[in-house]
Amino acid sequence: MDFLPLFHSLQGRLALVVGGGEVALRKARLLADAGARLRVVAPQIHIELRHLVEQGGGELLERDYQDGDQPGCALIIAATDDEPLNAEVSRAANARGIPVNVVDAPALCSVIFPAIVDRSPLVVAVSSGGDAPVLARLIRAKLETWIPSTYGQLAGLASRFRHRVKELLPDLQQRRVFWENLFQGEIAERVLAGRPAEAERLLEEHLAGGLAHIATGEVYLVGAGPGDPDLLTFRALRLMQQADVVLYDRLVAPSILELCRRDAERLYVGKRRAEHAVPQDRINRLLVELASQGKRVLRLKGGDPFIFGRGGEEIDELAAHGIPFQVVPGITAASGCAAYAGIPLTHRDHAQSVRFVTGHLKDGTTDLPWQDLVAPGQTLVFYMGLVGLPVICEQLVAHGRSAQTPAALIQQGTTAQQRVFTGTLENLPQLVAEHEVHAPTLVIVGEVVQLRDKLAWFEGAREDA
C-alpha cells in the first residue's frame, strides 16, 4: 500500500491552491465542500473560481506564486500546467511538512485525491495510488449506483441516537448487533424510502420499549419495466435484493427475476386473458397476510404498477389494513418498447399527444371511446390489445381513421427476443396471423410509426416486417 487512506479535517483551516484554471476550480470545490478557507494564487483566475473564493471569504492573489504563500496552510494544491513551478511548490511544502498534492504528478505528492462517493456524513473514497485515476473513477461510478443517496440521512440518524444507544447498551458487542439490525431493518428502510421522520419516530419507540424487537412487515410494489434488466431503477434493484418473499406475474422477465435475493421465497401469481393463476382479491389478501407475518414482501410487476397494473387496488387493500408499503415506478411498456423500436410516441410534425389504452377491459369487451381515439395529432398505444386487434382496427376505421394509418406490433419489446412488425390499420390483423405474433405484444397506431424506418437502432430478433 503506497498511500495510507485517511480523512483530513479541513474545517476552518487554510488551504492554498496554486493555479487559476478549471483543474484548480475542481480541486477548490472539493476543499470548499470540506469547509476549508481558500487562498488561490494565479496571474489569471477562472471566473467561477473567483466567485467560489469570494463567497467563502477566502483570499484571491492575482499574481505569480511566491514561497511566502505557504506558511499557515494545512494543505497545498499545485494545479498549473507549469511543471517547474509545480515541482517548486512541492519541494517547499515538503520542506515545511505541509501535505501537498500536485495534479497529475503522483511522484510530487505527499497526499493524493481519491475518487469520492459523497453521502455525507458517509463518504467512500477509492484510490489507485495515482496509477490509474480513470479506473478509480469507473469504480466510483459503480459505487454511486449501489449506494442510495439517502444513506447520508441514515448515517445522520445514527449519529443523533448514538449516545442514547450507548447508555442503554454499554456492552460493545450488544451495540454492534443493535446497529447491524437497525441498518438492515424497517427503520433504515423508512429512511431509504424518503420517510426520515417516520424512521425517527420508530427508533424513539424502539428505544422507549427497552429495545424489544418489533417485527413489522412491509410491501414493496415495484415496476420491473418492459423486460430489459438494465432499465430497472436503482431503488427497484435494492428492494428486490432484500425482500423475503416475491410475488411476480408473467410479464416479469426471467432475467429480472434472477436479480431478486437468491433465498427469497417466490410465488407466481400471473394472469392471462380469462385465466387467473391467482385471483386478484386473493393476491390482495396474500400481500396483507405475508406482511402481517413481519415479512418484507416484493410485489413485482411488469412495466409500471400504476399503468394497467392494478397496483392501485393492491395498495388500497394494504392501506385499509395499515400495512406499510412503498411504490417504485417502472418504465411502462409504451415508453420502453417504443424507444427500442425506434418509434417516438410524440413528434412535432406528427403527434402532439399520446394516449395509453387498454385493449382488454374489465368486462372483456373493447367498448372504448372511439370518437376520441380518432382525433388527429395523437398516437395510440394499446396494452393487451392482441386478441381484440381486429375489432380495434375495424372500429378506428369505422369512426373515421384512415385504413392506411401506420401501425406497429412490438412483441417482447426491449429484450433480445424483440420482434417488430409495421403495417397499417388495414393489414395489422393479417400480420399477426402471418408471423404468429403472440403476447406480450404492444400495438402502436399513428403517423409516428413511419419514423421507425430511419430511427430503428435496437436489433432484437431481426424478424421485422
Curated annotation (Swiss-Prot):
Source species, domain of life: Bacteria
Disulfide partners: none
Catalytic activity: uroporphyrinogen III + 2 S-adenosyl-L-methionine = precorrin-2 + 2 S-adenosyl-L-homocysteine + H(+); precorrin-2 + NAD(+) = sirohydrochlorin + NADH + 2 H(+); siroheme + 2 H(+) = sirohydrochlorin + Fe(2+)
Molecular-function GO terms, alphabetical: NAD binding; precorrin-2 dehydrogenase activity; sirohydrochlorin ferrochelatase activity; uroporphyrin-III C-methyltransferase activity
Binding positions (NAD(+)): E22, V23, P43, Q44
GO biological process, one term: cobalamin biosynthetic process
Gene3D superfamilies: Cobalt-precorrin-4 Transmethylase, Domain 1 (3.40.1010.10), Methyltransferase, Cobalt-precorrin-4 Transmethylase, Domain 2 (3.30.950.10), NAD(P)-binding Rossmann-like Domain (3.40.50.720), Sirohaem synthase, dimerisation domain (1.10.8.210), Siroheme synthase, domain 2 (3.30.160.110)
Active-site residue list: D249 (proton acceptor), K271 (proton donor)
Chain spans, region Precorrin-2 dehydrogenase /sirohydrochlorin ferrochelatase: 1-203
PROSITE patterns, per the entry: SUMT_2
Residues annotated as binding S-adenosyl-L-methionine: P226, G302, G303, D304, I307, T332, A333, M384, G413
EC identifiers of the protein: 2.1.1.107, 1.3.1.76, 4.99.1.4
Pfam families: CysG_dimeriser, NAD_binding_7, Sirohm_synth_M, TP_methylase
Region: Uroporphyrinogen-III C-methyltransferase, residue numbers: 217-465
Recorded metabolic or biological pathway in which this protein acts: Cofactor biosynthesis; adenosylcobalamin biosynthesis; precorrin-2 from uroporphyrinogen III: step 1/1; Cofactor biosynthesis; adenosylcobalamin biosynthesis; sirohydrochlorin from precorrin-2: step 1/1; Porphyrin-containing compound metabolism; siroheme biosynthesis; precorrin-2 from uroporphyrinogen III: step 1/1; Porphyrin-containing compound metabolism; siroheme biosynthesis; siroheme from sirohydrochlorin: step 1/1
Record keywords: Cobalamin biosynthesis, Lyase, Methyltransferase, Multifunctional enzyme, NAD, Oxidoreductase, Phosphoprotein, Porphyrin biosynthesis, S-adenosyl-L-methionine, Transferase
Biological role stated in the UniProt entry: Then it catalyzes the NAD-dependent ring dehydrogenation of precorrin-2 to yield sirohydrochlorin. Finally, it catalyzes the ferrochelation of sirohydrochlorin to yield siroheme.
Family: In the N-terminal section; belongs to the precorrin-2 dehydrogenase / sirohydrochlorin ferrochelatase family. In the C-terminal section; belongs to the precorrin methyltransferase family.
Name of the featured protein: Siroheme synthase
Natural source organism: Pseudomonas aeruginosa (strain ATCC 15692 / DSM 22644 / CIP 104116 / JCM 14847 / LMG 12228 / 1C / PRS 101 / PAO1)
Designated gene of the protein: cysG
